[in-house]
């Protein structure tokens, strides 16, 4: 959430940011109207309370002098009635202002390029060369079904479209990747945590998923939301709290749940876009002056997984029209998918500055008083999409899949997934 004082003093900066995000400026216009009315009511309320104090003293004086107080008491009743009306109006304006503030996105950083959509995202670097196949590569879903390690039919049978059952070496590969990613990030200095995946509304609001993305979330009947990403529970570990020692680096594996699988006809086959998927997350809490250096380091930490797996990828700097609601700056890591002949997102690494911390009230102490921390996070990585990249980039002509060398210790030394080695 932005600082209301900043919005009030620099409305044109916020309007410009909304325009660059391809958004209407109606929100800021409505906010400023309510803010003016709210402050006017605050002034009137203060004046009425001052007047009430004056009348109270006048009544006391009249009583002391045994004089008639009826007119002053009637005046006091009128003042009290108006104060109650004003207080109700103030509460209503304050609620409306808060609701609008929750819907205003973060202001992109000066190093976030201006653009309309993903086509305007500049490439920062390309790492690795896409493999040149001597045969026509198969998509991951065909490989998975042929090797009997991915069962889309059973997933649809027990849950519906957008769910998959991993079997045998498929399940082991998924688990191996989770363990591998967590161990790499632990060596990088992140503390592993294992948080709940049922999240309350306050926590979902703190990281910016609510209210804007409510329709993309799974809401349980008792009011809990299923975590769309580990970013939510991990960031909110410090909700309404002070962090006594910065920086704090955390990593977590969770299952994630989103309603968007196969939306608009995209990725309706395979496991690139699922309602339930696994992800390893990186989260940082840092001082404001270090947050952009820490974004570069966090991005490098996520990249290390791709480098160790020897998967070709690129890094793009998201433009203002593509960046997430809460982010000030984001790098996407995109892994090469041979059968699509393009790079696909496998991680987003973002600096939120104090946007999330202000919503979740996460602070640290300074000699000048409390300040909001800066929060950052990134996928390290999306596990299912890493499986996609391995199956497609490491496939062989005979239908088997080579296991990346770095994963073999996590799979009992197995070197391949084939119809002979499936369990």
Swiss-Prot record:
Q: Which GO terms describe its biological process?
A: selenocysteine biosynthetic process; seryl-tRNA aminoacylation
Q: Which domain of life is it from?
A: Archaea
Q: Which SUPFAM superfamilies match?
A: Class II aaRS and biotin synthetases, tRNA-binding arm
Indicate the quaternary assembly.
Homodimer. The tRNA molecule binds across the dimer.
Compartment(s) where it occurs, according to its Swiss-Prot or TrEMBL record: Cytoplasm
Report keywords, A-Z: Aminoacyl-tRNA synthetase, ATP-binding, Cytoplasm, Ligase, Nucleotide-binding, Protein biosynthesis
Domain commentary: Consists of two distinct domains, a catalytic core and a N-terminal extension that is involved in tRNA binding.
Q: Name one GO cellular component term.
A: cytoplasm
**Which parts of the sequence bind ATP?**
258-260, 345-348
Entry function:
Catalyzes the attachment of serine to tRNA(Ser). Is also able to aminoacylate tRNA(Sec) with serine, to form the misacylated tRNA L-seryl-tRNA(Sec), which will be further converted into selenocysteinyl-tRNA(Sec).
> What does it catalyze?
tRNA(Ser) + L-serine + ATP = L-seryl-tRNA(Ser) + AMP + diphosphate + H(+); tRNA(Sec) + L-serine + ATP = L-seryl-tRNA(Sec) + AMP + diphosphate + H(+)
Tell me one GO molecular function of this protein: ATP binding
Q: Where does L-serine bind?
A: 229-231, 281, 379
InterPro entries the UniProt entry points to: aa-tRNA-synt_IIb, aa-tRNA-synth_II, aa-tRNA-synth_II/BPL/LPL, Ser-tRNA-ligase_type_1, Ser-tRNA-synth_1_N, SerRS_1_N_sf, SerRS_core, tRNA-bd_arm
**E.C. number:** 6.1.1.11
In Swiss-Prot or TrEMBL terms, this protein is called Serine--tRNA ligase
For this UniProt entry, what is the primary localization, expressed as one broad class? Answer: cytoplasm
- Which source organism? Methanosarcina barkeri (strain Fusaro / DSM 804)
Reply yes or no: does the keyword Aminoacyl-tRNA synthetase apply.
yes
């Amino acid at each position: 959430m932005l600082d209301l004082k900043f919005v009030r003093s620099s409305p044109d900066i916020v309007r410009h940011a909304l325009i660059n995000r391809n958004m209407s400026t109606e929100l800021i216009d409505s906010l400023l109207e309510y803010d003016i009315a709210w402050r006017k009511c605050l002034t009137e309320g203060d004046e009425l309370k001052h007047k009430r104090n004056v009348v109270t003293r006048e009544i006391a004086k009249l009583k002391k002098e045994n004089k008639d107080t009826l007119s002053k008491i009637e005046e006091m009743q009128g003042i009290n009635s108006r104060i109650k009306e004003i207080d109700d109006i103030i509460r209503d304006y304050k609620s409306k202002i808060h609701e609008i503030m929750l819907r205003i996105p973060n202001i992109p950083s000066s190093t976030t390029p201006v653009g309309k959509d993903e086509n305007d995202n500049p490439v920062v670097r390309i790492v690795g060369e896409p493999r040149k196949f001597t045969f026509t590569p198969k998509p991951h879903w065909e490989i998975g079904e042929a090797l009997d390690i991915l069962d889309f039919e059973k997933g649809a049978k027990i849950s519906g479209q957008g769910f998959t059952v991993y079997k045998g070496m498929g399940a082991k590969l998924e688990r191996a990747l989770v363990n591998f990613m967590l161990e790499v990030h632990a060596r990088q200095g992140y503390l592993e945590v294992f948080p709940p995946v049922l999240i309350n509304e306050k926590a979902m609001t703190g990281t910016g998923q609510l209210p804007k993305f409510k329709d993309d979330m799974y809401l349980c009947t008792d009011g809990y939301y299923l975590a769309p990403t580990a970013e939510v529970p991990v960031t909110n570990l410090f909700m309404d709290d002070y962090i006594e020692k910065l920086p704090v680096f955390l990593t977590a594996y969770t299952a994630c749940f989103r309603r968007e699988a196969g939306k608009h006809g995209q990725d309706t086959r395979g496991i690139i876009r699922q309602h339930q998927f696994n992800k390893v997350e990186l989260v940082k809490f840092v001082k404001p002056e270090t947050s952009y250096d820490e974004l570069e380091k966090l991005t490098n930490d996520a990249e290390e997984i791709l480098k160790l797996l020897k998967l070709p990828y690129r890094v793009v700097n998201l433009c203002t029209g593509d960046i997430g609601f809460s982010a000030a700056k984001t790098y996407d890591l995109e892994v090469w998918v041979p059968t699509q002949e393009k790079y696909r997102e496998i991680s987003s690494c973002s600096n939120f500055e104090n946007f999330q911390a202000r919503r979740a009230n996460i602070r640290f102490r300074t000699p000048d008083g409390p300040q909001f921390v800066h929060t950052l996070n990134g996928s390290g990585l999306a596990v299912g999409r890493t499986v996609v990249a391995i199956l497609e980039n490491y496939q062989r002509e005979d239908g088997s899949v080579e296991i990346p060398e770095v994963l073999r210790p996590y799979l009992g030394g197995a070197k391949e997934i084939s119809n002979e080695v499936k369990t």
